[in-house]
Amino acid sequence: MATTAADGNLKPYLRKNGVKREHIGKNGYHNHKEKNGQGTDVASRCHKHEPFEQAPMYVAVLTYLGFGIVTLFGYLRDFLRAVGLEKCNIAQEREKQKDFVPLYQDFENFYTRNLYMRVRDNWNRPICSLPGPVFDLMERVSDDYNWTFRYCNRLIYDRHTVNSINSIMEEVSLRYMDSIHEELEQLVANFLGVESAMTYGMGFATNSMNIPALVGRGCLILSDELNHTSLILGARLSGATIRVFKHNNMQSLEKMLKEAVCSGQPRTHRPWKKILIVVEGIYSMEGSVVLLPEVIALKKKYKAYLYLDEAHSIGAVGQTGRGVTELFNVNPADVDVMMGTFTKSFGASGGYIAGKKELVDYLRTHSHSAVYATAMSPPATEQIIRAMKCIMGKDGSTEGLRRIRQLAENTKYFRSRLKEMGFIIYGNNDSPVVPVLLYMPAKVVAFAREMLARKIGVVVVGFPATPITEARARFCVSAAHTRDMLNQVLDCMNEVGDLLCLKFSRRKYSPQPDLCDETDFELDS
């Protein structure tokens, strides 16, 4: 295969990260036809099965038609309210407040009162038990089409949980920077294999308040189109120029990098002060995994910086739970800014920034999250320390490794069974985030209610949180789920899928054993 000029210096970096020469095609990218290409030898097996199957045409048409019908009925009901033929339960502005700026835009207000109110019983369900694979929902009923709810049960607090929290509070006290916070930061740095780390009390603010400290005017941010809202907000607050590349598309990213290097800033054409590439390890709504080796190769080639959000991947992927850097076997030092949260795998709250010591020292004095926010609470800090030590095996057991292995097995089993049934599934085979496409708004609501009737709690997401034709249910697989639990959910999924005609996939799925499964390692007895 002839080497093209567009390959440039990209191939040495790719080869260094484990990509072989025969995998490289035109413009330095893989020959394979998948939408997102194929990764390194270490993780190529999981990227070759990362499909984004499109909905059949009739499903897309019916989805648009469904939104059109409910919108038409919404305007009709607004008319009936205006003439007094239907009671209006929505809060009304006082006459003397008519000149005030409205809290909601016209469309948002219309959508809330006519569409969301009819189905809001499927969201914000009150949970009255501890987090776990099985939980209790408080029963509630509505006599006015979800404008108000009557709660039928009491919320019972767990006395043992309160006592354990009080004991931790007495043990570590409430000083701003206690030794427990320093212990956690050192533990995070060791876990990730970097020089230093810094923790924050809120995961969302870890992104939104730190990005403005890293870049500003005269800088360029290249952001994946499916990045989390916290990353988008942080980019906007920074004042930097923002350009969005197609999801996990290396051709789109390199095209923007080339243009940024060659053309510079608009009008003046001066070089950008910094170019920051912002990606996620596992994308929360798609379940896809970033093509990290290729992003690192492009970052090195064009002298850019890389910001990696591992909120959903840290503690979930990799042989020892160290995230996508371990999954792809890349050097953590190649990622300039490593961000993650403690709300998923560690069962707590807050987030962290990790990397070189100079970076962390700079953020301690320039980050709004560090200067103006309060420190992480001692109970949450202790919870994270114990969870991380369990994953690292520092508690003297192999329980952490067992859970990571169990999560990988559960993820692959759950995904493969759903594909066999005929559901359209997004994301990577190693991703515990499993989106099941439902498409039509009426079926989204019916799916959530039918699953709850079978005592299965699910999270459904629709427009405007997703594209109008890509409403979905999002399952997050846990290591605590047993095979019997998964089979129970799958049986209900199969039944409801047939009932509501949700099996849209036109692909025939034939499960094959993975001969290179990295999760098949022996645990110490």
Task: Give the role of each language-model region.
Residues 1-22, 27, 48-51, 55, ...:
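PLP-dependent enzyme catalytic core of the Aspartate aminotransferase-like
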Residues 13-19, 23-31, 35-176:
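Conserved N-terminal helix/loop that builds the PLP phosphate-binding region
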Residues 116-118, 290, 358, 378-429, ...:
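Conserved PLP-dependent catalytic core of the aminotransferase class-I/II
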Residues 185-209, 245:
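Short loop-beta-helix segment that forms the pyridoxal 5′-phosphate
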Residues 210-229:
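Conserved PLP-anchoring active-site segment centered on the Schiff-base-forming lysine
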Residues 225-233, 359, 469:
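Short, glycine/polar-rich helix-capping loops at beta-to-alpha or helix-loop-helix junctions
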Residues 243-308:
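Active-site phosphate-binding strand-loop segment of PLP-dependent enzymes
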Residues 320, 326-362:
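Active-site PLP attachment segment
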